[in-house]
Regions:
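Sec-dependent bacterial lipoprotein signal peptides
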Residues: 1-22
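A structural "domain/chain start" motif
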Residues: 22-94, 201-206
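Surface-exposed short loop/turn segments
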Residues: 24-43, 108-157
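Envelope-exposed proteins and targeting segments
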Residues: 52-54, 68-70, 86, 126-133, ...
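Short secondary-structure boundary motifs at beta->alpha junctions and helix caps
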Residues: 81-91, 157-196
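Structured, soluble extracytoplasmic/luminal domains of envelope-associated proteins
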Residues: 85-110
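Sec-exported extracytoplasmic/periplasmic mature domains
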Residues: 103-111, 195-203
């Protein structure tokens, strides 16, 4: 009798679990976003003397801990609070995305003279190294997106040649995709400033 009651209890519990499963919907797949790189056709010669064939290695790029998540972070501009959107994620680490866009932005501007920029993980010799420390990089749809970063340009042996701080904001579009697009444009503006600094460096010794 005891065995029968136990079997009935287990059967009832299993039925409840199966019934609950019928009403539970699986969590929706998150949307994935990637920081957009600049388009090559958007650039024209600016009349600045370029360093012929200059090679720049970008990295390390560091970000604050509050940004080091795959879920996209959105700031409430009124309450000055931030929140992670679990239904929207970066398709790569934010550090990798920032590095990629800066490399693309610099390469597009250095390419007319045969120059290029590449991540520090690439096994290539470089004339200069670019270190970037991101201090803030966030925003919200239909609100300002802010980028603040310290940077330094050094020789391959660590001698600091130039250093500075970039700080700018840009109004984002009404959707999350508009915020991501604004983040990409801010990085490209940052890349333009960095390239102007690179263009003032002495010719590299090889």
């Amino acid at each position: 009798m005891k065995i029968l009651r136990t079997a009935l209890a287990l059967t009832g519990a299993l039925a409840c679990i199966l019934l609950a499963g019928c009403f539970l919907k699986p969590a929706p797949e998150p949307d994935y976003y990637v920081l957009p790189s600049p388009e090559a056709q958007s650039y024209v010669a600016e009349g600045i003397t370029r360093l012929a064939g200059c090679r720049v290695v970008v990295g390390p790029v560091t970000i604050p801990g509050y940004l080091d998540h795959l879920p996209i972070l959105v700031r409430d501009p009124k309450a000055n609070t931030v929140a992670l959107k679990n239904d929207a994620r970066w398709s790569e680490s934010l550090t990798a995305g920032i590095t990629r866009v800066l490399c693309d932005s610099l390469t597009l501007r250095l390419a007319p003279s045969g120059g290029s920029a590449f991540p520090m993980e690439t096994a290539m010799n470089a004339d200069w190294r670019l270190f970037v420390n991101i201090m803030r990089f966030d925003g919200a749809p239909d609100a300002p997106v802010a980028l603040e970063a310290d940077w330094s340009l050094t020789t391959p042996y660590g001698e600091v040649l130039r250093h500075g701080r970039f700080k700018d904001t840009l109004k984002a579009g009404p959707e999350l995709s508009g915020m991501v697009a604004a983040m990409g444009r801010l990085l490209d503006t940052f890349g333009a400033q960095l390239e102007r600094e690179i263009s003032t460096l002495p010719a590299p010794r090889r």
